Amino acid sequence: MKELLYYTFIETEVTGAFLVFREKTQNLVFASLGNDKLFLLGKVEGFLKKHEKQDTMYDLQELKEAETYKKSIENYTICLENKMPLPSGAIPFEFLFGTDFQRKVWNELLNVEHGHVATYGDIAKRIGKPTAARSVGRACGSNNLALLVPCHRIVGSNRKLTGYKWSCKLKEQLLNNEKENSLSLSRL
């Protein structure tokens, strides 16, 4: 069985984003950050090939008619530019990939609010695995829904920035933008 996935690339002042939608559900299933569209396309193609299931092959096509996905794309751009925290459900997404443990971690990351951070150890405790901070870190590194599953809000036990799949510099910029945005919103 072939499953159709559509991709598009957006550019913002912060960075670019490569977005992949599942045609069957119209949900976002992959969001990767960076400015090199061809590099990101190659990464996604390699990832999909690696994760093809016995009975499912993925057909990745460029999104030509964006009307169905227009609102999600607009909201992701807002999210990337950190103009405001988006309400839950503003961008429908789903975990098409990932182990049960990874999905448990990713679901817990959804509870780390805009403008706040948590440690890998905090997340490990919240999912009932208090000694699994390193495994939580690996799950964060496997997150393929950048920003929506906010792994950029997770820091080391010393509260310092640690690795980020898309660069520590970008992680710092995203956190600073969220912090500024949260302060601006609290003044209203």
From Swiss-Prot:
Gene3D superfamilies cross-referenced by the UniProt entry? Winged helix-like DNA-binding domain superfamily/Winged helix DNA-binding domain (1.10.10.10)
A single GO molecular function term of this UniProt record: DNA binding
Instruction: Spell out the subcellular localization from the entry.
Output: Nucleus
- Which species does this protein come from? Saccharomyces cerevisiae (strain YJM789) (Baker's yeast)
Catalytic residues as annotated in Swiss-Prot or TrEMBL: C151 (nucleophile)
Q: What induces it?
A: In contrast to some bacterial and mammalian enzymes, MGT1 is not induced by alkylating agents.
Please list the residues that bind DNA: Y120, G121, R134, S157
DNA repair among keywords: yes
Q: What does this protein do?
A: Involved in the cellular defense against the biological effects of O6-methylguanine (O6-MeG) and O4-methylthymine (O4-MeT) in DNA. Repairs the methylated nucleobase in DNA by stoichiometrically transferring the methyl group to a cysteine residue in the enzyme. This is a suicide reaction: the enzyme is irreversibly inactivated. Prefers double-stranded DNA over single-stranded DNA as substrate.
Query: What EC number(s) does the entry state?
Result: 2.1.1.63
Name of the featured protein: Methylated-DNA--protein-cysteine methyltransferase
Catalytic activity reads: a 6-O-methyl-2'-deoxyguanosine in DNA + L-cysteinyl-[protein] = S-methyl-L-cysteinyl-[protein] + a 2'-deoxyguanosine in DNA; a 4-O-methyl-thymidine in DNA + L-cysteinyl-[protein] = a thymidine in DNA + S-methyl-L-cysteinyl-[protein]
Q: Which family does it belong to?
A: Belongs to the MGMT family.
Q: What is one GO cellular-component annotation here?
A: nucleus
Relay the record's extra comment.
Answer: This enzyme catalyzes only one turnover and therefore is not strictly catalytic. According to one definition, an enzyme is a biocatalyst that acts repeatedly and over many reaction cycles.
Where is it predominantly found? nucleus
Taxonomic superkingdom: Eukaryota
